[in-house]
Amino acid sequence: MLFTYNPLSGKGTVKQALSDILTIFTKGGYEVLVRPTLCAGDALEYISRNAAEFDLIVSSGGDGMLHELAYGIYASKADVPCGYIPSGTINDFAASLRIPKNIIRCAEMIMQENFLPVDLGRFNGGCFAYISAFGWFTDVSYVTGQKSKARLGPLAYVLTGLRSFEPKYLRENSGRVRIVWDGGDIEDEFIYCMIGNTHSVGGMRSIVPDGASLTDGLLDCMFVKTPHSLADIDKIKQIVINHKFDSDRTICIKTAGLSISCEKPFRWTLDGERGGEYTSAQIDVLPGALNIAVPPQA
């Protein structure tokens, strides 16, 4: 088994519990190679080159580590199952699959070897585990400081996200976008574009379409049109507060793939991390591409 972990994630809880985690894995019959990550991209590079050498790959950290785990296995083309021990601030993907928040319970759950093939997304040839997005609120996870996240937890995201309703922020993070999918197309001014497989974003279920699934072979997409009045801004706030979608401002679709063209470069987030700036993106589902350990009831 390969076990990679981010020693800086959360409050260093994995590092503190490392001996107990390794004991659980050893009792489960595995010889374990342990690799703490040294920098961003470290786990992705190692997993993509060496995944085929292991019977099981387990990673622990926040959403960034999850991204590297999924992308690394995808890039390796190896048919290897995996486990994920969430130790970040929010952990949307883990929550969607009911993966235990308690580190020890999660390690024990992985040793039950109950694996579920879940969908991944392909983004311009790359890969994401649960979300690709740009626009309103999408940069909160990576512009919020690590110290603030460790000290305040989810509240840190809320405090950072309050600026998302400032007029200057709304102007800078919206623009004309053309979206084409297998069931139609639309061109308009958009403030928020989200494509993924998750039940929550930033810990909030309100900004994810109803009926979202990680195993249906489809991407769950939501697009919010740019507000042009205080009334429009109030409608957007209702999405966050009450999960109330206004048909005039919001478009929700399920699709196996779509293309997005923008009049200006937008900053994308992939699994809560910086994904780069693009004026166009081709996004497709990768059905059942990640075989991950989940609780029996997930």
Label every model-predicted segment.
Residues S9-K11, W136-D139, S200-G203, H228-A231, ...:
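Short, acidic Gly/Pro/Ser/Thr-rich loop/turn segments
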Residues L18-I21, Y74-A75, G145-Q146, P209-A212, ...:
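Short, solvent-exposed amphipathic alpha-helical segments in soluble enzyme
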Residues N124-L218:
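ATP/pyrophosphate-binding catalytic subdomain of soluble kinases
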Residues M1-L155:
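Small-residue-rich beta-alpha loop regions that form the catalytic core of phosphotransfer
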Residues W181-D182, S213-D216, F223-A298:
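ATP/nucleoside-binding phosphotransfer catalytic cores, i.e., glycine-rich phosphate-binding loops
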Residues V14-L18, R205, I233-D234:
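Conserved strand-to-helix beginnings and helix N-cap segments that scaffold or border functional pockets
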Residues N6, D63, V140, C193, ...:
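A residue-level signal for conserved active-site and pocket-lining positions in enzyme catalytic cores
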Residues F3, V34, I179, C221-F223:
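Generic preference for hydrophobic
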